[in-house]
UniProtKB/Swiss-Prot annotation:
Transmembrane segments: none annotated. Coiled coil: none annotated. Pfam families: CDI (PF02234). The keyword Cell cycle applies. It is found in: Nucleus. This is Cyclin-dependent kinase inhibitor 1C. GO terms for biological process: adrenal gland development; camera-type eye development; digestive system development; embryonic placenta morphogenesis; genomic imprinting; kidney development; multicellular organism growth; myeloid cell differentiation. It comes from the Eukaryota. Keywords: Cell cycle, Methylation, Nucleus, Protein kinase inhibitor. Residues 207-220, 227-274 have a biased composition (Acidic residues). GO terms for cellular component: cytoplasm; nucleus.
Length: 348
């Protein structure tokens, strides 16, 4: 039953295709009815020859030309064929033959009638040897191509490229060799001097930290600002209890007794005693968890009172010409975030 179903379905499908307008109505062959059975090749051959004969007849009626014999039809018709020279026909309509990579045009044909229309079928077997014989009759095309190919690879461009390539490395070598040796000796002494300069201040700074209060630069610049920051946190009661005369009198007497001045011109012993007093006061005052800083409640009031008293002492020092012009004056407010390493070391 399976084969019968396929047979019926295939037949109905072919009928639908044949009845559609897309395909022309033609005689249905037996090959469609025997797809799943033995094929009759003789019958298929006869149907093919019949179809080709119908196509040839249609072409002859349309062009009045016999494409099988490659001659126009005799007798009156819609089209009149006339003989013309092959050179007058555009190259597009001429027959060509390809030899290797070149395509050559065939010469005039031996038959007397020239055709200006492209034939449907290929040339007959008799014309093949004529075309082969006529192809070698045009030798100028082959030697012309050979002559053109010969001058393309001459030996002249090779030395030209060599000459151009030779001076290029010479120029680059000269350009690279000149500047490179010059900066090398210049850079070495600079680096050596810089290294020496860097090593000297490092040693001096280390010695200054170990010696303590001997160098005047450290005492004149860093400790003053550090003292100012820590003194801003000093409580008011302790400053009120201390007599102001001692602060002003002790440094003056000691200055007259032992005037030891260094680069900044400030007495060293006075600063040492001030730092010792500050250390004792910092030990007595209440701390907020950070060394050198008071509790957050008394910071603002103590700072204002301290700066007011500090300004008076600065005026007295200026009147007595104790502070040289180049050194920072004590009445200047301490910088924000200044270093506090020296006082902390001494407190410890």
């Amino acid at each position: 039953m399976g084969m019968s179903d396929v047979y019926l379905r295939s037949r109905t499908a072919m009928e639908r295709l044949a009845s559609s307008d897309t395909f022309p109505v033609i005689a249905r062959s037996s090959a469609c009815r025997s797809l799943f059975g033995p094929v009759d090749h003789e019958e298929l051959g006869r149907e093919l020859r019949m179809r080709l004969a119908e196509l040839n007849a249609e072409d002859q009626n349309r062009w009045d030309f016999n494409f099988q014999q490659d001659v126009p039809l005799r007798g009156p018709g819609r089209l009149q064929w006339m003989e013309v020279d092959s050179e007058s026909v555009p190259a597009f309509y001429r027959e060509t033959v390809q030899v290797g990579r070149c395509r050559l045009q065939l010469g005039p044909r031996p038959p007397p009638v020239a055709v200006a229309v492209i034939p449907r079928s290929g040339p007959p077997a008799g014309e093949a040897p004529d075309g082969l014989e006529e192809a070698p009759e045009q030798p100028p095309s082959a030697p012309a191509s050979a002559v053109v190919a010969e001058p393309t690879p001459p030996a002249t461009p090779a030395p030209a490229s060599d000459l151009t390539s030779d001076p290029i490395p010479e120029v680059t070598l000269v350009a690279t060799s000149d500047p490179t040796p010059d900066p090398i000796p210049d850079a070495n002494p600079d680096v050596a001097t810089r290294d020496g300069e860097e090593q000297v201040p490092e040693q001096v700074s280390e010695q200054g930290e170990e010696s303590g209060a001997e160098p005047g630069d450290e005492l004149g610049t860093e400790p003053v600002s550090e003292q100012g920051e820590e003194q801003g946190a000093e409580p008011v009661e302790e400053k009120d209890e201390e007599p102001e005369e001692e602060q002003g009198a002790e440094p003056v007497e000691e200055q007259g007794a032992e005037p030891v001045e260094e680069q900044n011109g400030e007495p060293v012993e006075e600063q040492d005693e001030n730092q010792e007093q500050r250390g004792q006061e910092l030990k007595d005052q209440p701390l907020s968890g950070i060394p050198g800083r008071p509790a957050p409640g008394t910071a603002a009031a103590n700072a204002n009172d301290f700066f007011a008293k500090r300004k008076r002492t600065a005026q007295e020092n200026k009147a007595s010409n104790d502070v040289p012009p180049g050194c920072p004056s004590p009445n200047v407010a301490p910088g924000v975030g200044a270093v506090e390493q020296t006082p902390r070391k001494r407190l410890r």
